[in-house]
Amino acid sequence: MILQRLFRFSSIIRSAVSVHFRRNIGVTAVAFNKELDPVQKLFVDKIREYKSKRQTSGGPVDTGPEYQQELEKELFKLKQMFGKADMNTFPTFKFEDPKFEVIEKPPA
């Protein structure tokens, strides 16, 4: 009786594990497939090209002097609006504890 339950339980586990592995193998087969269709290949190549350009320039890619001027102008506006604070740091907040008055409870 116990042996039958053990065999039944092991067959259930075996089927669940096989389904799990079959599903994961199907996903990894697609992930490791290096043969891409031409559109995917162009897309991936453009992303890699953009990444390398961004790393070499250290900032926005394919921008002209007008972009830099606009960026400077907008940062200047923000500094004027928010008290000339450094826009690259998180502001520090200073909260003061409220002062409460002690009120005597009248005798009942």
Curated annotation (Swiss-Prot):
What this protein is called in its record is ATP synthase peripheral stalk subunit F6, mitochondrial
A GO biological-process term:
proton motive force-driven ATP synthesis
Q: What is the lineage of its organism?
A: Eukaryota, Metazoa, Chordata, Craniata, Vertebrata
Chain positions found as N6-acetyllysine? 41, 46, 79, 84, 94, 99, 105
Q: Gene3D superfamilies attached here?
A: Mitochondrial ATP synthase-coupling factor 6 (1.10.246.110)
| Chief location category | mitochondrion
Q: Which residues cross the membrane?
A: none
Record PTM N6-succinyllysine, positions in chain: 84, 94, 99
Q: Recite the UniProt keywords alphabetically.
A: Acetylation, CF(0), Hydrogen ion transport, Ion transport, Membrane, Mitochondrion, Mitochondrion inner membrane, Transit peptide, Transport
Q: Which GO terms describe its cellular component?
A: mitochondrial inner membrane; proton-transporting ATP synthase complex
Give the record's subunit note. Component of the ATP synthase complex composed at least of ATP5F1A/subunit alpha, ATP5F1B/subunit beta, ATP5MC1/subunit c (homooctomer), MT-ATP6/subunit a, MT-ATP8/subunit 8, ATP5ME/subunit e, ATP5MF/subunit f, ATP5MG/subunit g, ATP5MK/subunit k, ATP5MJ/subunit j, ATP5F1C/subunit gamma, ATP5F1D/subunit delta, ATP5F1E/subunit epsilon, ATP5PF/subunit F6, ATP5PB/subunit b, ATP5PD/subunit d, ATP5PO/subunit OSCP.
Q: Which organism is it from?
A: Macaca fascicularis
Could you tell me where this protein is found in the cell? Mitochondrion; Mitochondrion inner membrane
| Superkingdom of the source species | Eukaryota
Per its database record, what is this protein's job?
Subunit F6, of the mitochondrial membrane ATP synthase complex (F(1)F(0) ATP synthase or Complex V) that produces ATP from ADP in the presence of a proton gradient across the membrane which is generated by electron transport complexes of the respiratory chain. ATP synthase complex consist of a soluble F(1) head domain - the catalytic core - and a membrane F(1) domain - the membrane proton channel. These two domains are linked by a central stalk rotating inside the F(1) region and a stationary peripheral stalk.
Please list the GO terms describing molecular function. proton transmembrane transporter activity
Q: Does the keyword Transit peptide apply?
A: yes
Q: Which family does it belong to?
A: Belongs to the eukaryotic ATPase subunit F6 family.
Q: Where is the transit peptide?
A: 1-32
Please name the Pfam families in this protein's record: ATP-synt_F6
InterPro entries linked = ATP_synth_f6_mt, ATP_synth_f6_sf_mt
